C-alpha cells in the first residue's frame, strides 16, 4: 500500500466514504532494489526505525518480501512485537518456515515458505505439524504464479477464464518476459 491510502481509510472510518473497512500496510519491505515498489531494508537499525515509523503512521501491518537477511528479519519481528503490529507476507529465502512461525509472522504468501524450506520432507504431516495451533494464515494465491511453478505456456494461461483477473499491464509484462524464448 501507499501513504495516500491512510487518508482514504480515514474517510471510510469517518463515514465520509462508503466502502469496506481498509486494513493497510505500507509498501512491501525487501533487501533488494529489484522490486520498484519495495522499501529497501538492509540493516537491523533501519528495520527497527521503519517499524516505528509505520506504526506511528497508522499502518495495520508490515509486509515482508523474499530478500531479507536473517538479522534484518529478526529486527523487524522483534520491533513489531514490541509495538503490537503484525508482520505478514513472504517468508524470506534465508528464513526457515519453523523460524517464521516461531517469530510471530502472521501470514505466509504463496506457500513458498513450505516448498522452499529444505529442512522439511514436504509431507502433509510437516505442513500440519508446523502450522497447527500456530495462529498463522496461509494465502496460497498460486494460480497467478503457475508459470513459475510448472512452466506453462504464457499465452495458454492468458487465454484461460481465470486470466480475466490479470491486468493488461501484467499481461504485457508476462508476454514481454517470454518473448525471447
Report each predicted region and the residues it spans:
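Active-site neighborhoods of metal-dependent hydrolases
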Residues: 50-68, 114-181
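Active-site loop-helix segments enriched in His/Asp/Glu that coordinate
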Residues: 1-45, 59, 64-131
Amino acid at each position: 500500500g501507499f501513504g495516500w491510502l491512510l487518508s482514504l481509510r480515514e474517510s471510510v472510518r469517518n463515514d465520509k466514504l462508503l466502502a469496506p473497512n481498509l486494513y493497510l500496510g505500507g509498501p512491501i519491505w525487501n533487501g533488494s532494489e529489484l522490486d520498484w515498489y519495495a522499501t529497501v531494508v538492509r540493516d537491523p537499525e533501519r528495520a527497527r526505525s521503519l517499524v516505528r515509523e509505520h506504526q506511528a503512521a497508522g499502518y495495520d501491518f508490515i509486509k515482508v518480501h523474499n530478500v531479507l537477511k536473517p538479522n534484518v528479519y529478526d529486527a523487524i519481528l522483534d520491533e513489531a512485537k514490541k509495538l503490537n503490529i503484525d508482520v505478514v507476507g513472504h517468508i524470506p529465502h534465508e528464513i526457515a518456515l519453523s523460524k517464521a512461525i516461531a517469530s510471530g509472522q502472521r501470514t505466509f504468501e504463496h506457500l513458498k515458505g513450505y516448498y522452499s524450506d529444505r529442512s522439511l520432507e514436504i509431507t502433509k504431516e510437516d505442513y500440519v505439524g508446523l502450522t497447527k495451533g500456530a495462529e498463522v494464515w496461509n494465502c496460497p494465491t498460486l494460480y497467478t504464479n503457475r508459470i513459475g511453478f510448472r512452466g506453462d505456456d504464457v499465452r495458454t494461461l492468458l487465454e484461460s477464464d481465470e486470466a480475466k483477473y490479470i491486468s493488461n499491464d501484467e499481461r504485457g509484462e508476462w508476454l514481454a518476459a517470454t518473448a525471447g524464448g
